[in-house]
Amino acid sequence: MILISHRGNIDGPNTDKENKPSYISNAIERGYNCEVDFWYVNDKFILGHDKPQYEIPFEFITTYYNKLWIHCKNYDALTKLIEIDRGGVYFNYFWHDSDDVALTSKGNMWANPGCYIPNSIAVLPELKNDKLTDRLGVCSDYIINYE
């Protein structure tokens, strides 16, 4: 099962550190994949949940490309990644609004809380006590609990 840290969180939410590059790096160095909230604004790559917060060099994404699940937070972020990596050859990215499930550029199903689909990524299953049977992976603020 793929274990994905939600915004860098490992043992619970930490809104002061979520999406901070050093926090993301720490989760990856501990062996987890990581979901990040990604913006593209004024030709800059930026991480942040509700708003762009942490500008990052493109090399941050290329360094961790095989461990990142990139949640595009604005249309420009999505179109920039499509331009750079059409078809998700390198990067695993997706966009959604209020959908139950999103399809990533690598063909993975990103299933939001309460949506059970076999072979999908269960996102924050602790919120709805979601079943993990037959899942490809889990994305959680408490990812350490799924080891």
State each model region's role.
Residues 1-147:
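Phosphate-group recognition and catalysis centered on beta-loop-alpha active-site segments
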